Amino acid sequence: MQAMRFNFRTLCRNAAERGGQMQRRLLDALEARHTVKTLPEFGIERAAQLAGCTANHIRNLETRGDLPQPRLVDAGSIQRRIYNYNEVNRLRAAIGKRPSRPAGASCVRIVFSNLKGGVAKTTMSLHFAQYLAREGYRVLLVDADPQATTTGAFGFIPDLDLGDGDDLFPALTEAPELIAHAIKQTHWDSLDLIPARLALQYTDWRLSQPEERQNDSLGPPPVRLHRALKTLEDRYDLIVVDTPPSLGMLSLNAIAAANLIVMPIVPHMYDISSSVQYFRILEQICALYEREINVQRLCILLTKVDGSTETLNNIAVINGAYGELLLSNRMGLTKELQKSASDQLSIYEIDQPRGSRDTYNRAIMMLDGVNSEILLAARQIWQQEVLSGIEAGEAHHAGATS
């Protein structure tokens, strides 16, 4: 009896066909429950707190017609005003309290990056971008991870809602200006998204080909995202980039585009060892592309922190090695994040806690603490740029008058 020969190509073709049928069934099920995402709603006191004014001031603006009439919901025998974050931003604009980058400062590009997966890069980049939008800034969130988890968090189903041209690939391989065609509006008025698809992983292979290194019009493959994002700078105050858990061309492009790198680390020994290798690779990248890279600050964010003795000992080790790079705020383990993520929501988007109110409040406090510290680092980059511009102007004036 002749032994059956194993045919790997046939196996792959058959598996792809069966997988395609499975994928179509899954997409049909997803489409059936595909809903429009909305923001949480709250009362006038919370709206006033966020906007930095009093509730009476809001009422007066609405009465005079300086703001649209509020939405009302029945609350027993009375009607209650309700607002969301988008309406708070319109309120900020009406009273002159909408924040923005300083005059003379450029858009800051913040990249969440690490070689290792499972360190909460996507969780933190998503919540940081939404925090910035909640605070009133104009924000672009770039999903550079082919897993497209960030994209899914905004209600986009990559294989259903997105097609060719709806990710970074054209901007990195054809023309930097094409990045504008990939921008999607989200349910946050001041937060736009450049989504990802599984097909984006082809970018790593494409950019590593010899002919790409010889493409003078697009420039060196690792710096093309920087050039593409520069075409969007006038639109946004801050750009946030989520990266894949590897150091291929997509991650290299994100690093080369960054002003500020946030490096999440879980305080475990494997993650500490990975961080050493990460810094060695970053040093090599800087040596190769020194003129193109403009990273002005790197911050290490400890994530998934618990109170165990082992974790505390590891934090002491990390602090001894990287103390000046560590953010003072840390992101602890919280079930509220896990529960909201299972509903494809962020903590900032849920109306009611999935667990206890205390757990929810602790999660919000941790996120706000981390995000405000990262925003402070971005503001310091703005301040340094403005100061450098003033000094350059004074030096030019002194030279012209001497």
Annotate the PLM regions:
Residues 1-46, 50, 55-402:
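P-loop NTP-binding core
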